[in-house]
Amino acid sequence: MRSDTIKSGFEKAPHRSLLKATGAIRSSSDYRKPFIGICNSYNELIPGHTHLQELGRIAKEAVREAGGVPFEFNTIGVCDGIAMGHIGMRYSLASRELIADSVETVAEAHRLDGLVCIPNCDKITPGMMMAALRINIPVIFVSGGPMKAGHTPEGKTVDLISVFEAVGQCSNGSITEGELQNIEEHACPGCGSCSGMFTANSMNCLSEALGFALPGNGTIVAEDPRRLELVKAASRRIVDLVENNVRPRDILTRQALLNAFALDFAMGGSTNTILHTLAIANEAGLSFDFSELNALSAKTPYICQVSPATMAVHIEDVDRAGGISAILKELSSIDGLLDLSAITVTGKTLGENIANAEVLDRSVIRSISDPYSATGGLAVLYGNLAPQGAVVKTGAVSPQMMQHSGPAKVYNAQDDAIKGIMEGDVKAGDVVVIRYEGPKGGPGMPEMLSPTSAIMGRGLGDSVALITDGRFSGGSRGACIGHVSPEAAERGPIAALQNGDIITIDIPARTMSVALSESTIKERLAQLPPFEPKIKRGYLARYAQLVTSANTGAILGHL
């Protein structure tokens, strides 16, 4: 066992003395057992994490019952919703790297034999996955579970996105402040990751398809007693994984990634899943290119439409309809789409995991013969504005905005764009451009939920598009095209845009372009002053120096 490095032999007497002082060692026989890290992300700042302390306690008990010795430690976490719309959002994506580095540090420094990872919200799950693949010791994921959707006294179903969009509605006078407060009070009824197919829930659902989590991980709500049973089962299972030396890189094959992307496209997951999955693939040493995604999307039907694409369905409804296993079972009937032989942490193949799954509500999970669209709910666009690609959540774009051409309304910062939208500077037909908000330019590639919600709230969702080198919340909806690569800070073509330039978006054709010649774009870029970093001290300054483009997952490169 790896942990023998810190516990076996007379030379390790000082180490054993310290281990006894932790209280985790109950008898000398514990030194013959695997040391299991309980990697918890409990904190009181994120509603999706406030209940994780109890899950950690249950996990420790289950590990001990299964024959392991548990040691709990914590990671940081950022609530994207609370960090939204101010400087805090610049730290969100950057926190993923800190989480990965910190989990790696603890597991390697203490020679842990395996990990039970308890994440929930946006950057915590991918950060822990990146670390798991980096250190490559047995691991199992069990998330905190989704929040239930909210309901107003009048019976209206609401969620966090309802509140963001209601701010825009209040600003243009379509609802009163009292009506806004009513939505605010009922949108988030309890603990859990926000209730739609936003980034947190998307990643926790993908954990099942990747093979890192037990069935039910992505959809059983946080307050459901079955969530506690899932924690127990996962925590018992890690001891078997250690004994059989089943490691993350054994599970995360190229085909497992394709399985996850197929699920992602079928349920219209957050655009951030592409960013994170590329970063996870990098840690596994797997090369995966943006351009491959459209080919997979072309043969993956969009069969499960969840908020923000519709307010009629939330994650709890997906669970009731059969969960992720039911979606995968439906997809498995498409010849060659899924690799059902992929191994998983259950000890069974993906095919065995979903063998008995069935769709219990066809209004939530459609048949592959009756999809919302014949192609997946995410797409990569290319053109002279995004030579290296840009990402759009097609499942949340209205039919009339699938093709759009209009004049650019250019902003060099998200705050300026929000002000312009709220003050009425953005008109029907415009294409809002928010640049210098990419991984380097932001820095941190902040999410654009506030401007997209303002557009929707002001009734412009069917007439205004938004493109950015930043990214979007999983809760954004509308013609929102992000991850434009190269970004403005790296002299990408988006930096050459001027107000009034005509931008054409053709999502079915997977293209996005501006009506400018290549020579004009080059001339404009040559006239720009050198990019000046917005933040010059602290972690974000270091992050901006090392981070790579969005089309590679916005991972940290090397000096």
Curated annotation (Swiss-Prot):
Its cofactor is [2Fe-2S] cluster; Mg(2+). Transmembrane segments: none annotated. Gene3D superfamilies: IlvD/EDD C-terminal domain-like. Pathway: Amino-acid biosynthesis; L-isoleucine biosynthesis; L-isoleucine from 2-oxobutanoate: step 3/4; Amino-acid biosynthesis; L-valine biosynthesis; L-valine from pyruvate: step 3/4. One of its GO terms (cellular component) is cytosol. The modification N6-carboxylysine is found at K123. GO terms for molecular function: 2 iron, 2 sulfur cluster binding; dihydroxy-acid dehydratase activity; magnesium ion binding. Binds 1 [2Fe-2S] cluster per subunit. This cluster acts as a Lewis acid cofactor. It catalyses: (2R)-2,3-dihydroxy-3-methylbutanoate = 3-methyl-2-oxobutanoate + H2O; (2R,3R)-2,3-dihydroxy-3-methylpentanoate = (S)-3-methyl-2-oxopentanoate + H2O. It comes from the Bacteria. The keyword Iron applies. InterPro entries: Dihydro-acid_dehy_C (IPR042096), DihydroxyA_deHydtase (IPR004404), DiOHA_6PGluconate_deHydtase_CS (IPR020558), ILV_EDD_C (IPR056740), ILV_EDD_N (IPR000581), IlvD/EDD_N (IPR037237). Its EC number is 4.2.1.9. The active site is at S473 (proton acceptor). HAMAP family: IlvD. Homodimer. Belongs to the IlvD/Edd family. Functions in the biosynthesis of branched-chain amino acids. Catalyzes the dehydration of (2R,3R)-2,3-dihydroxy-3-methylpentanoate (2,3-dihydroxy-3-methylvalerate) into 2-oxo-3-methylpentanoate (2-oxo-3-methylvalerate) and of (2R)-2,3-dihydroxy-3-methylbutanoate (2,3-dihydroxyisovalerate) into 2-oxo-3-methylbutanoate (2-oxoisovalerate), the penultimate precursor to L-isoleucine and L-valine, respectively. This is Dihydroxy-acid dehydratase. It comes from Chlorobium chlorochromatii (strain CaD3). The gene is ilvD.
